[in-house]
UniProtKB/Swiss-Prot annotation:
Annotated signal sequence range: 1-21
Source organism of the structure: Arabidopsis thaliana (Mouse-ear cress)
Compositional bias ranges of the Basic and acidic residues kind: 351-365
Keywords, in A-Z order: ATP-binding, Glycoprotein, Leucine-rich repeat, Membrane, Nucleotide-binding, Phosphoprotein, Receptor, Repeat, Signal, Transmembrane, Transmembrane helix
Residues that span the membrane, as ranges: 284-304
Binding site residues for ATP: L399, G400, R401, G402, S403, V404, G405, I406, T407, K421
InterPro entries: Kinase-like_dom_sf, Leu-rich_rpt, LRR_dom_sf, PRK1-6/SRF4-like, Prot_kinase_dom
Low complexity biased stretches: 326-336
Protein name: Probable inactive receptor kinase At5g67200
Membrane topology listed for this record: Single-pass membrane protein
Superkingdom of this protein's organism: Eukaryota
């Protein structure tokens, strides 16, 4: 009883010392972590001491203002409009791992948002009407249980990340009245019922998705650069596929005239601006006299030509068709006067000058922007489904940036949707126009179920476009990682087997078409899902067009897909490099882990790792996983010579399929 009597005084003494700041680290270690989190947050976010959070007042922090607990843990913290002024410090509220609702609206908090990734149970986050700044908080993208996100009326800047689609449970998303710029991502949250991005600096066409189509123009207002059918605002005709649609200079236009001096095919000569009227009149008179002289000279040349032609018809002079005079003609020409000999020479020079001018005109005309032809490939030649003008007018949505260029989704005025890849001019400058055309004629003719077909290509003035079919089902990377929780299991192994076979068939087709053809950039982002969710390779055979010696550094995942022999070298990829990348892809399929997180171990150790990543007990589909793991390990050996060919890989996969079918047909299993 004596101990129970003194215990409250003991705690009161401790709390008094903590509130006074004596030995904070020692006493904080004696407090519940949630209480420490609140006090730490108050120390930087409540500079005006509006919150009476003090352990001298009451030890039960669950009764503090705005706090709600469940089983001794804080699950709600609502401090809206309480006059907070300060900054949201890191390692404070992030300790509240049971927090469901966090509301700090209508205060004067400033600075960036700290790392909130530890709030794994957070469902509602209200940070509106403060002075927060910086980029969109990246840690928010990992809060997969989040349903309400409101960060409006702050000073956030930069782009809205496309990874926001990972928050697939969102019902409310309010980003209005910040400083966000760039394009609007293609949001696809099926439960989203409240959405607002008004009052930002967003630009480009608003993606027409089932989610965004639910909202009217009020959700997008005060973004002058936005356009599209959702807000009924026409987009500018300028095509995003070129750095500039008006690059014409005086040297590029025909006959030395600028593009601005052309009007409906007629060349308009601008008047010469002078300061004195007398000089202007003199120029006019001089020009008239010169023109008259040219006319007279032209008439003389015509008469001379007719006379010579008459004499040639009479046998006086007849040149050899090959340009070589016969002996009698040479003797005759030597007896002719210089005037007679000069006439055919003068006439010949005039024709040569005409031909030279025609060639110069044609070469100059080819340098006019947009004068290049849109070249269709394969069976698309006879179809001609669209023109270059239609592509230039198309509304475009940025899909991504790759190692060789930028990819857009283009919606043409006839509602046809295509994918346009604009190649990086700096990286492909080493390839001449003729070499590019020859290569595209070969690659553009490749047709296989597991290849995204190249429909057409275009090049002019250093700009190069490649047009593919559009695949709305997205990439294999999105299927594997996408909006799935990091705790979700990887794809079912039968799906892995089917996808692996599709990819192997596509690679084998490329390799057997020509020994010079390789994919060169195989990874999950370059594999698209077809109409029946078959795997289709894209961006194939483009690495040969780039300058490998000046390649920019890859991200860790892309680098992990590269074979060791080319990872830090300027060597060109080979078919065995594709095989290596295929082995990496199998492990990404089986484990759901990015390529940069794959270990490099012996096959039996790799099987243990795969099984651990899939959270499967030993013996569960063990034989099948073992065969798949062994195939991946063979593809991923360091020595290129020891790697199998894609034909051998296909046989391995078919053996796995046959083993599966035999087990499924066994009546005793």
């Amino acid at each position: 009883m004596t101990l129970n009597f003194f215990l409250p005084f003991f705690f009161f003494f401790i709390l008094l010392r903590v509130s006074a700041g004596a030995e904070p680290n020692y006493f904080n270690s004696l407090l519940p972590s949630d209480a420490v989190a609140l006090l730490s947050f108050k120390s930087t976010a409540d500079l005006d001491n509006k919150l009476l959070y003090s352990l001298t007042e009451r030890y039960d922090y669950c009764q503090w203002r705005g706090v709600k607990c469940a089983q001794g843990r804080i699950v709600r913290l609502v401090l809206s409009g309480v006059g907070l002024r300060g900054y949201f410090s890191s390692a404070t509220l992030s300790r509240l791992d049971q927090l469901r609702v966090l509301s700090l609206e209508n205060n004067s908090l400033f600075g960036p948002i700290p790392d909130l990734s530890h709030l794994v149970n957070l469902k509602s986050l209200f940070l509106s009407r403060n002075q927060f700044s910086g980029a969109f908080p990246p840690s928010i993208l990992s809060l997969h249980r989040l349903m309400i996100l409101s960060i409006s009326h702050n000073n956030f800047s930069g782009s809205i990340p496309s990874e926001i689609n990972a928050l697939d449970r969102l019902t409310s998303l309010n980003l209005d009245f910040n400083r966000f710029n760039g394009t609007l991502p293609s949001l696809n949250q099926s439960f989203l019922t409240s959405f607002n991005v008004s009052g930002n600096n967003l630009t480009g066409v608003i993606p027409v998705t089932p989610t965004l189509s639910r909202f009217d123009a009020s959700s997008f207002r005060s973004n002058p650069g936005l356009c599209g059918e959702i807000i009924n605002r026409a987009c500018a005709s300028r095509s995003p596929f070129f750095g500039s649609t008006n690059k014409t200079t005086s040297s590029e236009a025909p006959l030395g005239q600028s593009a601005q001096a052309q009007n409906g095919g007629a060349v308009v000569i601008p008047p010469v601006v002078t300061k004195k009227k007398g000089k202007e009149s003199g120029l006019v008179l001089g020009f008239t006299a010169g023109l008259a002289s040219l006319i007279v000279l032209g008439l003389c040349l015509v008469v001379f030509s007719l006379v010579i032609k008459k004499r040639n018809d009479d046998g006086i002079y007849e040149p050899n068709p090959k340009g070589e005079a016969s002996l009698s003609q040479q003797q005759q020409s030597q007896n002719q006067t210089p005037r007679t000999r000069a006439v055919p020479v003068l006439n010949s020079d005039t024709e040569s000058q005409k031909r030279e001018k025609e060639v110069q005109f044609q070469e100059t005309e080819q340098r006019i922007p947009n004068s290049g032809n849109l070249v269709f490939c394969g069976e698309s030649r006879s179809q001609g489904m669209y023109t270059m003008e239609q592509l230039m007018r198309a509304s475009a949505e940025l899909l991504g940036r790759g190692s060789v260029g930028i990819t857009y989704k283009a919606v043409l005025d006839n509602q046809l949707i295509v994918t346009v890849k604009r190649l990086d001019a700096a990286k492909t400058a080493v390839t001449s126009e003729e070499a590019f055309e020859n290569h595209m004629e070969i690659v553009g003719g490749l047709r296989h179920t597991n290849l995204v077909p190249i429909r057409s290509y275009f090049q002019s003035n250093g700009e190069r476009l490649i047009i593919y079919d559009y695949h709305p089902n997205g990439s294999l990377f999105n299927l594997i990682h996408g909006s799935r929780s990091s705790r979700a299991k990887p794809l079912h192994w039968t799906s892995c087997l089917k996808i692996a076979e599709d990819v192997a068939q596509g690679l084998y087709y490329i390799h057997q078409t020509s020994s010079a053809l390789v994919h060169g950039n195989l990874k999950s982002t370059n594999i698209l899902l077809g109409q029946d969710f078959e795997a289709c390779l894209t961006d194939y055979c483009l690495s040969v067009l780039t300058d490998s010696s000046s390649a920019s550094p890859d991200d860790p995942d892309s680098s992990s897909y590269k074979a060791p022999e080319i990872r830090k070298s300027s060597r060109r990829p080979t078919s065995k490099c594709d095989v290596y990348s295929f082995g990496v892809l199998i492990f990404e399929l089986l484990t759901g882990k990015n390529a940069s997180r794959h270990p490099f171990m012996a096959p039996h150790d790799m099987l243990d790792w795969v099984r651990a990543m899939r959270e499967e007990e030993e013996g569960t589909e063990d034989n099948r996983l073992g065969m798949m793991t062994e195939t991946a390990c063979l593809c991923r050996v360091t020595s290129p010579e020891q790697r199998p060919t894609m034909r051998q890989v296909i046989k391995m996969i078919q053996e796995i399929k046959e083993s599966v079918m035999a087990e499924e047909n066994d009546p005793f299993r």
